[in-house]
Amino acid sequence: MPRVKRGVQARARHKKVLKQAKGYYGARSRVYRVAFQAVIKAGQYAYRDRRAKKRQFRQLWIARINAAARQNGLSYSRFINGLKKASIEIDRKILADIAVFDKAAFAVLVEKAKGAL
């Protein structure tokens, strides 16, 4: 069997990794060995943070709802409990949006929640 030289495949693989590492600082964008490690680590961070992003946004929404609810004289937990008892099903993302951009509508929701408690 003839000897197979893998220069073409190696070159293609190196080019692919270096293309992914474009914009990285120093050797991370120029040296294959370092770039490969940087790309792998970047992928791990991206995977982890796609999941963390969901938690962080939920935390942000809850903080905004809590602040707006307290301005209207109700804590977050009592507000959410009141909404559930009043059969108002609005998710936290929309509630946070209403709290930030439409304070009057949020005040109405707080009153309904208070009434249901």
Swiss-Prot record:
InterPro entries: Ribosomal_bL20, RIBOSOMAL_L20_CS, Ribosomal_protein_bL20_C. This is Large ribosomal subunit protein bL20. It comes from Vibrio cholerae serotype O1 (strain ATCC 39541 / Classical Ogawa 395 / O395). It comes from the Bacteria. One of its GO terms (molecular function) is structural constituent of ribosome. Gene3D superfamilies: 6.10.160.10, Ribosomal protein L20. Binds directly to 23S ribosomal RNA and is necessary for the in vitro assembly process of the 50S ribosomal subunit. It is not involved in the protein synthesizing functions of that subunit. Belongs to the bacterial ribosomal protein bL20 family. GO terms for biological process: ribosomal large subunit assembly; translation. The keyword Transport does not apply. Keywords: Ribonucleoprotein, Ribosomal protein, RNA-binding, rRNA-binding. Pfam families: Ribosomal_L20.
